């Protein structure tokens, strides 16, 4: 299978890329046509195997292999082989055991392969006298960085493992359990690397040529201040790790024949944990810096901490009840679904960490060893064992990160009701009427960490008509 996708239109754009899209936006709309076309080649093969051990016990196997190549023969090409094996064993007349293992590769999107240029807009002059409109001036320094194509980016590969039980119960009822675990150790994310640039600031004290009643001009040779600014290159890498696991239940309670209604009940508990293996770096907190840095949102160096210790955790327990009624005489099917989220948990965990290094404005990396923890870092980027008298400094232990704010959040129980009515129109097709969140349940509720009420279940209400035809 071969496919190609390309958008030749420009789309929504700025008429002048030298100007910010809006104040302090740090970005520009990107033309769709600036992104190369997407080429993909894929091939898939599978085979099924059945072994009838005896009249009761049967073993079924499904083996598959998928090959994918994106942007073949280019310097950003990615390829993958994704094998999978699914097994099912009939242990008794009423019990089937099934399991599977496989790899699933996700190709990077075009925004990852061909990142857009990065823009950083900083105010260079801000002179706004209220009584002299003609002299008012607002000027920006715009730093543009051409981000390189992601030549070393790999497919994000997920290892999927699952084990399930299928039970056949009296009355044509069925009960199924499924446990699963998926791990993606190389998901897409930022691969932090820095460059620095110099940004001049001009004020009425130095650099601005002010003539009352006339336009203010700038003497670019006489800035009031020059800042050295850190900026990331926008490089993308395989720096995200995700582990997703859980258990699912499906219970087919059979049919209530007098009213032609089937009852289906399901439940699921899931847990997702994500963390980054990217370099963990931060600016120095402004409270520890002199005003020459804190007032202008700059930092004398970047502080580096251990990676992979912070994570985001999400847990959820949900139940769904579905009723499906067939009305043969009217050639109609009505369905009603009730869903409740009993448990909704999230946590952004920040570990207790101490600095392990720092990056100075010349982009040199310096280690911070355990015996340096009681020392000081000067704004000149040098280490001091005691407080220096001739330069402002930051105590290294003050830059330790504490996890005191890592409090889990538990949201209150919410529920949702939806319905659908489908009508067949002979052999030509049919139509469906549907409504989601039919009770328009969007309550204001508080979470476990705050008494502030916030609206839940938002953007879930919708209704409409679907029309389909049989060709």
Which residues fall in each region the model found?
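C-terminal beta-signal and adjacent terminal beta-strands/loops
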Residues: 339-401, 412-413, 418-471
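Gram-negative outer-membrane beta-barrel transporters
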Residues: 200-353
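Residues on the lipid-exposed face of transmembrane beta-strands in outer-membrane beta-barrel proteins
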Residues: 2, 43-49, 85-91, 163-167, ...
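Outer-membrane beta-barrel signature, preferentially recognizing the C-terminal barrel domain
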Residues: 32-36, 105-184, 205-213, 227-255, ...
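Residues that define the transmembrane beta-barrel architecture of outer-membrane proteins
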Residues: 37-43, 77-81, 157-161, 241-247, ...
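Face-selective signature of the C-terminal outer-membrane beta-barrel domain
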Residues: 1-74, 246-248
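Transmembrane beta-strands of outer-membrane beta-barrel pores
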Residues: 2-8, 65-73, 101-107, 116, ...
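Repeated loop/turn-to-beta-strand initiation elements of outer-membrane beta-barrel proteins
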Residues: 54-61, 94-97, 171-175, 257-262, ...
């Amino acid at each position: 299978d071969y496919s190609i996708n390309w958008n030749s239109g420009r789309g929504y754009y700025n008429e002048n890329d030298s100007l910010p899209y809006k104040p302090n936006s740090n970005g520009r709309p990107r033309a769709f046509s600036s992104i190369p076309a997407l080429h993909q080649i894929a091939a898939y093969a599978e085979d099924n195997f059945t072994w009838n051990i005896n009249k009761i016990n049967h073993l079924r196997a499904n083996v598959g292999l998928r090959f994918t190549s994106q942007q073949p023969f280019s310097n950003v090409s990615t390829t993958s082989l994704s094998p999978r094996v699914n097994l099912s064993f009939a242990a008794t007349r009423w019990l089937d055991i099934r399991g599977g293992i496989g790899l699933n590769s996700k190709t990077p999107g075009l925004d990852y392969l061909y990142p857009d240029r990065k823009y950083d807009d900083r105010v260079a002059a801000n002179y706004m006298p209220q009584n002299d409109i003609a002299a008012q001036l607002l000027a920006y320094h715009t730093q543009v960085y051409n981000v390189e194509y992601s030549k070393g980016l790999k497919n994000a590969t997920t290892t999927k493992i699952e084990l399930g039980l299928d039970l056949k119960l009296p009355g044509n009822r069925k009960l199924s359990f499924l446990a699963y675990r998926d791990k993606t150790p190389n998901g897409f994310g930022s691969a932090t690397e820095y460059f620095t640039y110099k940004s001049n600031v001009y004020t009425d004290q130095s650099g601005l040529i002010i003539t009352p009643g006339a336009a203010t001009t700038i003497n670019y040779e006489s800035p009031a201040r020059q800042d050295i600014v850190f900026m990331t290159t926008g490089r993308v890498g395989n720096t995200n790790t995700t582990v997703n696991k859980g258990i699912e239940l499906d219970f087919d309670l059979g049919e209530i024949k007098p009213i032609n209604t089937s009852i289906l009940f399901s439940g699921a508990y899931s847990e997702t944990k994500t963390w980054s293996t990217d370099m963990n770096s931060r600016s120095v907190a402004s409270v520890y810096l002199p005003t020459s840095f804190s007032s202008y949102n700059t930092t004398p160096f970047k502080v580096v901490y251990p990676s992979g210790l912070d994570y985001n955790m999400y847990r959820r327990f949900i139940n769904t009840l579905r009723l499906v009624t067939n009305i043969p005489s009217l050639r109609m099917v009505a369905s009603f679904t009730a869903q409740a989220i009993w448990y909704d948990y999230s946590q952004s965990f920040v570990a207790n960490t101490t600095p392990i290094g720092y990056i100075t404005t010349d982009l040199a990396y310096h280690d911070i060893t355990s015996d340096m923890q009681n020392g000081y870092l000067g704004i000149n980027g040098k280490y001091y064992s005691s407080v220096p008298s001739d330069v402002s400094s930051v105590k290294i232990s003050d830059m330790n990160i504490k996890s005191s704010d890592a409090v889990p959040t538990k949201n209150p129980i919410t529920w949702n009701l939806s319905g659908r009515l489908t009508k067949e129109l002979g052999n030509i097709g049919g139509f469906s009427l549907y409504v989601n969140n039919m009770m328009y349940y969007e309550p204001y509720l508080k979470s476990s960490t705050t008494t502030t009420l916030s609206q839940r279940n938002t953007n879930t209400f919708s209704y409409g008509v679907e029309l389909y035809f049989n060709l």
